[in-house]
C-alpha cells in the first residue's frame, strides 16, 4: 500500500492501519521527481494507493492503473476514490487487526531519497521496527517521567528515522 501524503494525522492512521492489517506500508516522499514516482510505482506494484490531496494525486496519476489499483484519499480528488473519513466512520478496528503477524514478516518498504540514481527500497520487518522502538524508548526513558511530553518533529513521515519516531511518540 503506497502512502503519498504530507505529514498529518491521517498519514499516521493509514500507516498503522495498513501494517496492523498485515499489509506492507510503502510511504513515499512528496518531493520525488516524476521519474522517481514512476520507478517506485513500477517497483513495488501497490494494490492500494493512499493519497492526501488532488495536488499529490496529479503527480502519480499517469503511472497508475485505476482499474487495478484502489485509491483512498484524505480529500476529494479528480479520480474515483474512497474517502478516509468514510472508512474510519464505518470500520470496526478490532476485526481488522491481523492476529497472525510475526516479527519476521515485512511491515513496510522505505525508499531512499534517490540522490544517487533510482530510489532504493528497504524492507523493514515488524520485528525490526519493534527493535528500533525498544531502543529509542530506552534512550527516551527520562521523558516518560514528564506528564504529557511534547514532541516536535519536522522530517517527512516517509523518512526512515521519522517513521520510527512516530511510534515512539505514541509509546512515550
Residue ranges of predicted features:
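Conserved AMP-binding A3 loop
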Residues: 107-133
Amino acid at each position: 500500500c503506497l502512502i503519498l501524503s504530507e505529514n498529518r494525522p491521517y498519514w499516521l492512521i493509514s500507516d498503522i492501519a495498513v501494517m496492523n492489517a498485515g499489509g506492507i506500508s510503502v510511504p513515499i516522499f512528496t518531493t520525488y521527481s516524476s521519474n522517481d514516482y514512476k520507478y517506485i510505482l513500477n517497483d513495488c506494484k501497490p494494490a492500494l494507493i493512499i493519497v492526501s490531496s488532488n495536488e499529490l494525486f496529479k503527480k502519480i496519476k499517469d503511472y497508475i492503473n485505476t482499474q487495478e489499483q484502489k485509491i483512498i484519499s484524505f480529500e476529494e480528488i479528480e479520480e474515483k476514490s474512497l474517502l478516509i473519513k468514510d472508512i474510519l466512520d464505518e470500520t470496526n478496528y478490532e476485526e481488522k487487526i491481523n492476529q497472525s503477524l510475526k516479527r519476521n514478516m515485512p511491515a513496510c518498504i522505505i525508499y531512499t531519497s534517490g540522490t544517487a540514481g533510482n530510489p532504493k527500497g528497504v524492507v523493514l520487518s515488524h520485528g525490526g521496527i519493534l527493535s528500533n522502538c525498544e531502543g529509542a524508548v530506552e534512550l527516551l526513558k527520562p521523558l516518560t517521567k514528564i506528564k504529557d511530553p511534547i514532541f516536535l518533529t519536522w522530517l517527512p513521515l516517509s523518512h526512515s528515522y521519522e517513521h520510527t519516531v512516530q511510534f515512539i511518540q505514541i509509546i512515550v
